[in-house]
Amino acid sequence: MKLYIGQEIEDKEDVYIDASSARSILACGKRGTGKSYTLGNVVEEIHTETDDIVPLVIDPMGIYWTMAEENDDQRDLLWDWGVTEQGFPVNLLVPGDPADRYGDDIVREFRSRGIDLNPLLLNPSDMTPDGWCELFDLNINKPMGITLYRAIRELNEDDTPFYLPDIINKVEMDGSSSDRTKEALLNRLEMARDWDIFADEYQDVWKTFDENRINVLDVSVLDPGQYGLRNLVVDVLGKELFRQRQDARRREEMGLRVEIPKVWLFIDEAHNFVPSGSSSLAKDMLIRWVKEGRQPGLSIVVASQQPSAIDSEVLSQCDITLCHKITTKEDIRSLDKLSQDYMGSNLKTYVRQIDNVGEAVFVDDDEETVQMVKIRPRKSQHGGGEA
């Protein structure tokens, strides 16, 4: 399976990504050079060229719903490339109630444009005791952390799904904690109820996705931050997808029927989720996805205008790099560490050859190739332009 991404700048030969197996891809470039555009390009190809893969876009800017619209703005350019403008079916996932997040007018407009709009809610029982403590920034060796950890651990022992009211009840019934500790912890749990991201009944993640659409998770409606709700949603969702694909892979190896497809996870502004030099709620999960995801059929594409701000463990595991224009010393230095002997020169030497928006250095470690590429125009509307 090959994904058409553009042409070599000099000889105009078509350039493809070999997607016959799981891949880990870095798309980077300073603002306005095309990294989000390129990410959308790969999403289009995955949707068009595969029938056993679910594309899931983590969208921190609220711009990828525009993939449902045709790229009328570049119709002439598309014609020159022999490509036809096209809108794609989009399943827009919203943490919480879409009407509360967007307003009724926006919801109606989305649906009038053919966009399928669905809430995504988290199962509280999918989070570990440590995860709950991290969410509230609680030390598990101090009273509130001890109380919450104990409550989640005891609920897990029943081996059945549990919800926020169950956690609240467990804390209220804790005879080992002081009233002051319980009151402070209950205030935090009531605050979590107001976030409107936790389910009141069990949610099967896969029933939220649509295998026939591009799945876009709009986390722009949530507060940012390394320990904010965006990271929480990505962490819980990613862990569940990883677990289910591991189970599916075991069945595949035994020749048994599998209902859980492979996943390509696309993350824009990835430095907010796997930051260099600091932690986040989603960081450990995403590093595991990059390191161990190939075997269960999990691919990832991380995009950032600040590659130096992405954890080095993620960068070093990427087997494809699509680098647009980069100028800051920190970013160039970070990318240059990815240089390999087969390149014949340091990566920064190739980056300096980029002259125009939409051009990129394409490095494929599996093929041991380096190419200067002009990224093909998008078939669908790009939502990343400035107002």
Predicted regions and their residues:
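N-terminal pre-Walker A segment at the start of P-loop NTPase domains
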Residues: 1-14
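Pre-Walker A (Motif I) flank of P-loop NTPase domains
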Residues: 20-25, 211-215
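Conserved P-loop NTPase motor module
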Residues: 25, 356-387
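Walker A (P-loop) phosphate-binding loop of P-loop NTPases
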Residues: 32
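Conserved lysine of the Walker
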Residues: 35
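Hydrophobic positions on the alpha1 helix immediately C-terminal to the Walker A/P-loop
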Residues: 38
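P-loop NTPase motor domains
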Residues: 41-57, 61-288, 295, 352-368
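Conserved ATP-driven motor cores of ASCE-family P-loop NTPases powering translocation/secretion/packaging/pilus
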Residues: 44, 289-370
